[in-house]
C-alpha cells in the first residue's frame, strides 16, 4: 500500500491537502502495520513548508517496517507554486546525520525508486527524482484518470478516452487493440525541465490525474 504523507503536523497537513484527515492517515498506516501489509510512505519535501520534518519522516522507517520514499515535486497544477528538493540535496542532508548509509542494489518492486538502508532501521529510504534524475527510458507507467482517459505520460495532456470506447459498446478486441496502439505511442521522455521557459502542457491538478 502506498500512502502519501508529507508532514507529521496536523496544521501543515491541513494546509497542504485542504482536508482535516491527518489522524485518519496515521490510523491507516498503523492498521496496515497491524495487518502485516507492506507499506510505502511517499513524501514530498517543499522549501519553506516542511523541510524541517525531513528527519522526522525518515524516523518512521526506524519505528516501523515501512519504506519512506521522497519524491521530487513535479511542476503540475499546484505543484508549480512550490520549490522542492532534488535527490542530491536530500542525500547530502541525510548524510550529515547518517554517514554510514548503504545503497540497496536489489530491486524493491518494479518502480523507479532508488533505495538506501540505514543501520538499525526496519525499512528503507527511497528517492524518486523524476526531474533531476530522468528515468523515462525505463518508465513502465500509464495512468487512468477519474474521467476515463488513459494518460501515457504525466507531462503531456494527451491520451485516449477509454470511457468513450466502453460507452460505445466496443468489443474487447477493439479495446485491447486501442490499448496496444496507445502504449506504442508513449512519449520517449517528459520535458518538465522546460517548464520555466514554455510552461507544462498538462493543466489539470495531480488529484484530477490520479497521482
Regions inferred by a protein language model and the residue ranges of each:
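Radical SAM/AdoMet-radical enzyme domain recognition
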Residues: 1-71
Amino acid at each position: 500500500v502506498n500512502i502519501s504523507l508529507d508532514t507529521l503536523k496536523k496544521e501543515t497537513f491541513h494546509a497542504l491537502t485542504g482536508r482535516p484527515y491527518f489522524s485518519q492517515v496515521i490510523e491507516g498506516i498503523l492498521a496496515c502495520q497491524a495487518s502485516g501489509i507492506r507499506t510505502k510512505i511517499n513524501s514530498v519535501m517543499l522549501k519553506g513548508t516542511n523541510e524541517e520534518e525531513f528527519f522526522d519522516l525518515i524516523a518512521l522507517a526506524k519505528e516501523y517496517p515501512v519504506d519512506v520514499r521522497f519524491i521530487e515535486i513535479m511542476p503540475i497544477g499546484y505543484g508549480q507554486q512550490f520549490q522542492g528538493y532534488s535527490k542530491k540535496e536530500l542525500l547530502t542532508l541525510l548524510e550529515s546525520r547518517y554517514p554510514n548509509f548503504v545503497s540497496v542494489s536489489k530491486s524493491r518492486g518494479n518502480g523507479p525508486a532508488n533505495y538506501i538502508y540505514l543501520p538499525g532501521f526496519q525499512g528503507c529510504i527511497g528517492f524518486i527524482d523524476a526531474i533531476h534524475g530522468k528515468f523515462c527510458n525505463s518508465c513502465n507507467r500509464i495512468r487512468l484518470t477519474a474521467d476515463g482517459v488513459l494518460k501515457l505520460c504525466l507531462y503531456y495532456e494527451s491520451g485516449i478516452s477509454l470511457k468513450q470506447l466502453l460507452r460505445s459498446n466496443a468489443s474487447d478486441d477493439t479495446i485491447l487493440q486501442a490499448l496496444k496502439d496507445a502504449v506504442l505511442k508513449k512519449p520517449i521522455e517528459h520535458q518538465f525541465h522546460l517548464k520555466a521557459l514554455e510552461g507544462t502542457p498538462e493543466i489539470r491538478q495531480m488529484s484530477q490525474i490520479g497521482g
